[in-house]
Amino acid sequence: MNNQTLEQNITAYINGGFIPIEVKPHIINNLNPKFALRPYQNEAFSRFNFVLNQYNQRKKPTQLLFHMATGSGKTLVMAGVILDLYEQGYRNFIFFVNSSNIIEKTKDNFLNSLSSKYLFNETLSIADKQITIKEVDNFEIANQEDINIVFSTIQGLHSRLNTPKENALTYEDFEDKKIVLLSDEAHHINAETKKGKKTKDEVESILSWEGTVNKIFNSNLDNLLLEFTATADIEHPEVRKKYNDKLLFDYPLKQFRKDKYSKEVQLLQAELNQFERALQAVVLNQYRRKVFEKNKINIKPVMLLKSKTIGESKSFFTEFVDGINNLTPATLNKIRNNATNPIIERIFNYFDTQNITISNLILELKGDFSEDKCISVNSKDDSVEKQLIVNSLEDIDNEYRAIFAVDKLNEGWDVLNLFDIVRLYNTRDADHKSGKVGKTTMSEAQLIGRGARYCPFKLDDTQPLFQRKYDDDIENELRICEELYYHSAHNPKYISELNKALEQIGMKSIKTVQKRLYVKDSFKDTDMFKNGVLYLNKQTVYDRLDILELDKSIKDKIYNKKFLT
């Protein structure tokens, strides 16, 4: 096993039955019970416990990477790891990330017991001792019976340590203490790693974010650097080399989707102007709300309207609000009559069967998508309150339906009830020479991946709460409640490129299968063969093992038979 990566080694141990998949009681009992641990999260905890306490090739100080798909619950795993490390004597933690938005969201998840996304139980108790989680500025005056966490951006951490102030964190804080560094969206600390070879001056003198982190990390042999990300760029030669003995757990988006923990993605292109395209998404979004309500499920779908620039986003916000306020039957009828996708026809037919007139629908949309239920998150100076609003869109008392943004929400946005994304520009940036997916398209695919977190619901206890249920039931109206729609202008080349990007990140499967069909030569000369489509039935073996008695229709039927006497 010496030539294998750490992740491969641990996988071999698990497959050989040497590592049981189990979670310690002090983790289970102290996490919020409404967040039921999933099998892959249990495996992550088991891997971590093994490496920390039993793996004889463990290096000290220890650096480990949890490479987990967007939406797979990395932060919950992080919370469980903190509890586990407290039980093993660790008290001081530094949580750092690239974005201040994620800092505020994480503080809310870790510290605010009233938050709907609070990660811990109401009371925390380890070894019959109640403990508290506290935010601190430094560790010198922190209570060493508490879980003490410094929250900082990477840039802020670098600045605080290299330009020290009174009562602030300093390098001296780490000299005699065991520190756990928790890095969320950890791919950002690899800025220097990707440079490859550096000049002598760079090696000796550059103060960087990555350098600051490593200086803290190496100050004590018992320190831990735990990285969490969905996009570590493991294929980059320098990054792959760096993480060869550090990658602890790899649960990619492809497997996450295959295990049915994500929404399915649908691409909907239309020959409509920007407002009409957004309106079509509004109609679809409202239909989905009605399907939820019909099935007595209290979920409010929201939508994201994505512009290319902040100026365009602000301008369209005004256009959208005015368009909804002045909505007419003619505009909605245009959406209906020009629809090229069956889902739009299905929606309007549903409204007809439910006796929802166009006039009544307009009144609904004017109320549900009014200006006070739309929010723009484009400014660098957005308030903390605004950040918390967009991270609590699932809350019952949060009535926002439409979010307008450029790239403010590209990382750290973990809203579950996002069901529609509207692309409000038509450009594409494919690398025509190499045939590679362009950077913009790839970032859009990654945004779709973040938006495809599954919004949990079930009709009864026989159904899984956190997984898709209707993949094979294509006529079920609830299927649309397990789908994320991405709305764009009609641009086949862009859609083709986006599909390619989604396949690369694992959000769409490649379903090309070659089949050999034998047809008569005479059939090859027909228009059907030249221009039509051939369908091949898939045979499924019916083993009849679940049949224990005659069908009721046979048992209850009265059979008449005449006998000769």
Model regions and ranges:
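Helicase-associated low-complexity regulatory tails and linkers flanking the ATPase motor
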Residues: 2-12, 31, 46, 88-90, ...
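Conserved adenine-nucleotide phosphate-binding loops and their immediately adjacent elements
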Residues: 20-34
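N-terminal pre-P-loop "Q-motif" helix
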Residues: 34-60
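Walker A/P-loop
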Residues: 58-81
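Short hydrophobic/aromatic beta-strand immediately N-terminal to the Walker A/P-loop
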Residues: 64-67, 94, 304
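Conserved H-loop
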Residues: 71, 97-98, 229-230, 407
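Conserved catalytic segments around the Walker B and adjacent sensor/switch elements
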Residues: 90-96
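Generic enzyme active-site microenvironment
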Residues: 96, 182-183
